[in-house]
Curated annotation (Swiss-Prot):
Residues 373-435 are annotated as: Disordered. This is Prolyl 3-hydroxylase OGFOD1. It catalyses: [ribosomal protein uS12]-L-proline + 2-oxoglutarate + O2 = [ribosomal protein uS12]-(3S)-3-hydroxy-L-proline + succinate + CO2. Its cofactor is Fe(2+); L-ascorbate. 2-oxoglutarate binds at Y169, R230. InterPro entries: Oxoglu/Fe-dep_dioxygenase_dom, Oxoglutarate/Fe-dep_Oase_C, Pro_4_hyd_alph, TPA1/OFD1_N, uS12_prolyl_hydroxylase. It holds the Pfam family 2OG-FeII_Oxy_4. The keyword Metal-binding applies. Keywords: Cytoplasm, Dioxygenase, Iron, Metal-binding, Nucleus, Oxidoreductase, Vitamin C. Its EC number is 1.14.11.-. It is found in: Cytoplasm; Nucleus. The keyword Oxidoreductase applies. One of its GO terms (biological process) is protein hydroxylation.
Length: 542
């Protein structure tokens, strides 16, 4: 009898359970050959192109939108579920606040793996063909989740090797009122961002990609929804780096020496407590210990009230300060200020205040203030007297620097061994103390950023706050000090009405004002006419 002998019964074969393989297919925008040629031609000629499945625009820089990138809704829902199960980490600094997953480069979830495959194989090949850029196989993608008040401020994405950025949105029904738009900036004659000229609203399954260049300035606007999350996958395709245009350096802000003004101005303006010499000694001891201090109720109440009234109801001319990749706030036109505000500005420029600040801090901001050299000479004279009287001698102590700037320990030690300060000492001895300052208005959306050309030097920062009643730290608007190259904050100064903040910083310390978010509008519930706060911001140099 012909036939196969039945297999002997035995134990079932045990092996690893294989994960179900998932396939993803993308839009006709990528697979249709005629369309591909048209898109490639538009890219090459830098001309707009519009089709129902793909739109390319050149204004303000080359960007492209594919409204329905993945064909299968089931795939997208599976992908969303896997992403929501990832661990997210809060990302927080001067530039952004949102949650980000770990790198998706090696995740094994089926839908994430399938998306990674089509993006960095098939789609990368299509992008290389239409852009004529030799894109590398480098995988660079992660998942971001933006919730209420999260934002990513103005930047250009430029980093060695990044050539094309992409974002795939997986959001619930979304409109402009929810925030979270991808805002694109025009540029000025110096290739710096100028203003938002286009906003792309996230939508489910929309893919946006754009060419990364020295002018690809964009931001993710603050998310205003308290219920909905803005979920997206984003990353970059890498290739040969572009040549950057020469760096643009802003003209330095002029510094001026003190205005001759006698001490009467202090008695007119400042709380008498702070003019008591014994109290000034206490302040200096505390300041030398920590390099910062907050002096509450600094101005006399009647003067402070008049200043606040002029700020709230006076005819102050404000102008916006940018560019937005460095700062966004309003500055008062000093020459057109109401008289009381002019007088307040004069106070901070005055010779008497320079001397008072010297007494508060131990810094030599006035020729009458004792310097470290004076203190050393006094010590030497005392030692010489001891030698004469006792007929003995001993080694003089090492010079001491009583004033330590806000910094971390490792940086302080670098400062002490750096030969550069010696070179500057001669300049310092012959230089005249100077200052620069402005009156600023802070409202929702305002901020300052640390940037590549942020100048770090020894300086005393002074801030006097007005109109901060009811202001909470969660609104933003506080000033943060960080060590250069680090995200960890060394010091945070929160706005507090009629409080004078003094901070001495070194060349390894940078500062920024945190983005003011939409929670700040809650201030209006208590103060209907308020839309933020003001500060007098000055910097003093020895």
């Amino acid at each position: 009898m012909n036939g196969k002998r039945p297999a002997e019964p035995g134990p079932a074969r045990v092996g690893k359970k294989r994960k179900k393989e998932v396939m993803a297919e993308f839009s006709d925008a990528v697979t249709e050959e005629t369309l591909k040629k048209q898109v490639a031609e538009a890219w090459s000629r830098r001309t707009p192109f519009s089709h129902e499945v793909i739109v390319m625009d050149m204004d303000p820089f080359l960007h492209c939108v594919i409204p329905n990138f993945i064909q299968s809704q089931d795939f997208l829902e599976g992908l969303q579920k896997e992403l929501m199960n990832l661990d997210f980490h809060e990302k927080y600094n001067d530039l952004y606040k949102f949650q980000q997953s770990d790198d998706l480069k090696k995740r094994r979830e089926p839908h994430i793996s399938a998306l990674r495959k089509i993006l960095f194989e098939d789609f990368r090949s299509w992008l290389s063909d239409i852009s004529k850029i030799d894109l590398e196989s480098t995988i660079d993608m992660s998942c971001a989740k933006y919730e209420f008040t999260d934002a990513l401020l103005c930047h250009d994405d430029e980093l060695e090797g990044r050539r094309i950025a992409f974002i795939l949105y997986l959001v619930p029904p979304w409109d402009r009122s929810l925030g979270g738009t991808l805002d694109l900036y025009s540029i000025d004659e110096h290739f710096q961002p100028k203003q938002i000229v286009k906003s792309l609203i996230p939508s489910w399954n929309k893919l946006v990609f754009f060419e990364v260049s020295p002018v690809s300035f964009h931001q993710v606007s603050e998310v205003l929804s308290e219920e909905k999350s803005r979920l997206s996958i984003s990353g970059w395709f890498h290739g040969p780096s572009l040549t950057r245009p020469p760096n643009h350096f802003e003209p330095p802000i002029p510094r001026s020496p003190h205005i001759p003004q006698d001490h009467e101005i202090l008695y007119d303006w400042i709380n008498p407590t702070y003019l008591d010499m014994d109290y000034q000694v206490q302040i200096q001891e505390e300041f030398e210990e920590s390099s910062e201090i907050l002096l509450k109720e600094f101005l006399k109440p009647e003067k402070f009230m008049k200043v606040c009234e002029a700020l709230e109801h006076g005819d102050v001319e404000w102008s916006s300060r940018g560019p937005p990749n460095k700062r966004f706030y309003e500055k008062a036109e000093e020459s057109k200020l109401p008289e009381i505000l002019k007088e307040c500005m004069k106070l901070f420029h005055s010779e008497a205040l320079f001397l008072l600040l010297s007494n508060f801090t131990g810094l030599k901001l006035h020729f009458l203030a004792p310097s470290e050299e004076d203190e050393m000479n006094d010590k030497k004279e005392a030692e010489a007297a001891d030698i004469t009287e006792e007929g003995t001698s001993h080694s003089p102590p090492e010079p001491e620097n009583n004033q330590t700037a806000i910094s971390n320990n490792s940086q302080q030690s670098n400062e002490q061994t750096d030969p550069e300060p010696e070179e500057n000492e001669t300049k310092k001895e012959s230089s005249v103390p100077t200052c620069q300052g402005e009156l600023r208005r802070w409202k929702t959306g305002h901020y300052t950023l640390i940037h590549d050309h942020s100048k770090a030097e020894f300086a005393l920062d002074l801030i006097l706050y007005c109109g901060c009643e009811g202001w909470e730290p969660e609104y933003g608007g506080f000033t943060s000090y960080i060590a250069k190259g680090e995200d960890e904050e060394l010091l945070t100064v929160n706005p507090e009405s009629n409080s004078l903040a003094l901070v001495y910083r070194d060349r390894e310390t940078l500062k920024f004002v945190k983005h003011i978010n939409h929670r700040s509008l809650e201030q209006k519930k208590t103060f209907p006419n308020r839309t933020g706060f003001w500060d007098f911001s000055f910097i003093y140099y020895e």
